[in-house]
Amino acid sequence: LLKNYINVDLKKSFFKSNSKNYVSEFLKKEKKINSDIIEIHNRPNYIQYLKNLENKKIILYFHNDPLSMNGSSSIEDRIKLLNNIDKILFNSTWSQERFFIGIKNKLLLKQKTFVCYQSTNIENINFKKKQNLISFIGKLNSAKGYDIFGNTIIKILNKYPKWKSVVIGDEPREKLFFNHKNLEINGYTRHENVLKMLEKVSISIVCSRWEEPFGRTSLEAS
């Protein structure tokens, strides 16, 4: 997958929103690639800029609450999405039900949607490998509760000096800093290395502030 990855470099524009600017740059690359299927994750507001594409399947994935996102918060927004997208996928029935709040004929319209649960390979857990290690994996922002984790983990590590903690993730838009001799903070880490690290972790912390659908972090840590 990585060898086929193409990054979209953005230059700041005073005349376009970041979303419109991003999609415009994407469409330039897409014109050369000519994909059959275009997947959009958690950005329903991008759909309005793709309506002129022809002979392509458009699939929208919701990982979070649709009612909290620009482009799907209102009933009108969501009906437009249903009329302009080939398929809408949710990672939980909770987020699917949230999408259809206030929409009539939802049983008929649900045929255009599908719930695709998070998944991972089943592994045998070797508890002998477990260490006194606490992990936090994900975006290092307040929405994911990293500020709660950071303030709390310092107290825990002070009280239990034989325990250590490791943090994996980054967040360029919000800077939260925590320091402790037993706290190791890593940036972006390849997925296979994250899974290897989880083999040693005894406690994995997930402290999001909202009714987050069952995420992959919880699943893989278990």
Can you name each region flagged by the protein language model?
Residues 70-73, 100, 114-133:
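Acidic anion/phosphate-binding donor-loop and adjacent secondary structure
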Residues 199-213:
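Acidic donor-binding loop of glycosyltransferase active sites
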Residues 65-66, 94-95, 112-125, 172:
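Short beta-strand->alpha-helix junction loop in the catalytic core
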Residues 174-195:
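Nucleotide-activated donor-binding/catalytic signature segment of Leloir-type glycosyltransferases, i.e.
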Residues 40-45, 62:
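Short His-centered aromatic/hydrophobic patch
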Residues 89, 126-144, 150-154:
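Conserved donor-binding/catalytic core segment of Leloir-type glycosyltransferases
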Residues 71, 78, 83-111:
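A short, active-site helix/loop in glycosyltransferases that binds the activated sugar's phosphate group
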Residues 137, 150, 163-177:
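Glycosyltransferase donor-sugar binding loop
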